Regions:
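Bacterial N-terminal signal peptides
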Residues: 16-28
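Catalytic nucleophile-elbow at a beta strand-turn-alpha helix junction centered on a G-D-S/GDSL motif
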Residues: 62-77, 103-106
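N-terminal secretory signal peptides that target proteins for export/translocation
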Residues: 1-15
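Alpha-helical cap/lid subdomain in secreted, periplasmic
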Residues: 7, 54, 58-59, 80-96, ...
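Short linear motifs centered on Gly/Pro in flexible linkers and helix caps
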Residues: 5-7, 29, 35
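N-terminal pre-domain segments of enzymes
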Residues: 32-61
Length: 443
């Protein structure tokens, strides 16, 4: 195992985010260094190289993030999760996002529009997710792998030359039967695994971050079908385009590659002294008689209701990926709680916890299905969705339509005027939330 270190300029951000001047990528080397496999014969032929890991936050304040990919990106699901998360859960970064999904696209296709569509807006950081169309829904062959490698490498080099940081995402996996392919799913997934391994080679060569979409999706999809039945489709009902659960797996891969820590703050209450404190973008307004009132500029990630057995449920994907413990750690700690049990009311919900549990700390988003942030989070998320929908129209229909062919620069200027209020609506939707946590001893 070797470590390659990339020097970064010093950034001044909150201690919560642990922003450092050096971002290190732990890069696995050696042909024998592979990801562990589940103990099942279906994985026997797979040799997934050990994925590099990002250490330290790759994002910087005021970053301009480009999220790039094919029709899976154009679904505007994982891209929406990412933008909403970065806006709501890491508000101090003030990251802005553009979504560039294009159905049917390969890495070569984006390479050819990279300058006109993306680099003109001077992104400071970018993520890509290609390989699904590049693998051509057939078994792997070396010539196609080399074609993929050359185009992926050209994209990485193009963004690096423009001064942008980069996250190279692997393709995902396919499900049991792709309707438009006669190749078996095993052959296609072995092909996609090879393209994933090529992406790792490029990430190591170019010293950029890597987002492993393929291996978690393949292994967690297998786990989910064992738990919920064969109808659970991590790769989507058409075996290619994931529903919300699979999209959460994708978003999780990119959050990990971006070096997101997931600590969203802690509320600490001392019942013995009657004092309370809060960290991470939360302010104590009052604490009396066991009732803590807070004002929060940082939101937890709030998912709509959904069954864990539903592959089109965000909550299902969050459970599969341990999302709450990894990226949604908003905690309540109660000290000097002598009673055996306590009722905790947060927003519309009330739960009972032991004094020991409260002393150790509880993860609020994991324990409360409904939160005081839900309505504000939904408004913000809807604003993100509206903007991303327009970005698809802006690029596909206008930049590459009659308007763009007639006068590209005028089209850019006019569409940017239309996009500006949609981007502003996201910022306006992010408002502080005042909420209470009530702690009562159970007699």
């Amino acid at each position: 195992m070797t470590r390659l270190r990339i020097r970064r300029h010093r950034d001044f951000m909150t201690p919560l985010l642990r922003v450092v001047s050096v971002v290190a990528f732990s890069l696995a080397v050696g042909a024998q260094d592979f990801e562990p496999k589940p103990d099942a014969t279906v994985f026997a032929k797979f040799n997934a190289k050990k994925a590099p890991t990002t250490q330290g936050l790759l994002l910087r304040k005021d970053d301009r993030l480009a999220i790039i990919g094919d029709s899976i990106t154009e679904q505007k699901m994982y891209s929406r999760i990412l933008e909403t998360y970065l806006t709501a859960c890491l508000p101090e970064l003030k990251v802005t996002v553009r979504q560039y999904g294009w159905g049917g696209e390969t890495a070569e296709g984006f390479k050819n529009r990279m300058v006109n569509d993306a680099l003109r807006f001077k992104p400071t950081i970018a993520t890509t997710c290609y390989g699904m169309n590049d693998h051509k829904y057939r078994p792997y062959d070396a010539a196609n792998g080399q074609w993929y490698r050359e185009n992926q490498l050209a994209i990485v080099k193009g963004f690096k030359a423009a001064g942008a940081r980069f996250v190279l995402g692997s393709p995902g996996c396919v499900g049991p039967k792709v309707p438009w392919s006669n190749a078996g799913s095993e052959a296609m997934n072995l092909n996609l695994c090879e393209l994933r391994n090529i992406d790792i080679d490029i990430a190591q060569q170019e010293q950029v971050a890597f987002a492993d979409v393929f291996w978690p999706m393949l292994t967690l999809g297998w786990k989910a079908t064992n738990q919920f039945g064969e109808n659970y489709a991590i790769a989507g009902k058409d075996a290619v385009h994931p529903g919300w659960a699979g999209q959460v797996v994708m978003a999780t891969a990119f959050l990990q590659a971006l070096g997101v820590d997931g600590d969203l703050g802690t509320f600490t209450v001392d019942l013995g002294t009657g004092k309370a404190s809060a960290t991470g973008g939360h302010e104590v307004v009052a604490f009396t008689n066991g009732e803590l009132t807070l004002k929060s500029g940082r939101y937890p990630f709030c998912a709509p209701a959904g069954e864990l057995s539903d592959d089109n449920s965000i909550r299902s994907g969050m459970a599969l990926t341990d999302f709450n413990s990894r990226f949604n750690r908003l905690r309540l700690v109660v000290k000097n709680a002598p009673a055996k049990e306590y009722k905790v009311t947060w927003g519309p919900g009330t739960k009972t916890f032991s004094g020991k549990e409260l002393a150790e700390g509880i993860l609020l988003p994991a324990r409360f299905a409904k939160t005081p942030f839900d309505d504000a989070f939904k408004r913000l998320d809807e604003a993100v969705g509206t903007k991303q929908n327009y970005e698809t129209k802006q690029i596909k229909s206008l930049f590459h339509g009659e308007e763009g062919r007639a006068d590209m620069e005028a089209t850019v200027a006019l569409t940017e005027k239309a996009r500006a209020p949609l981007a502003a609506a996201i910022r306006e939707a992010l408002v502080p939330v005042t909420h209470t946590v009530k702690i009562e001893a159970v007699n």
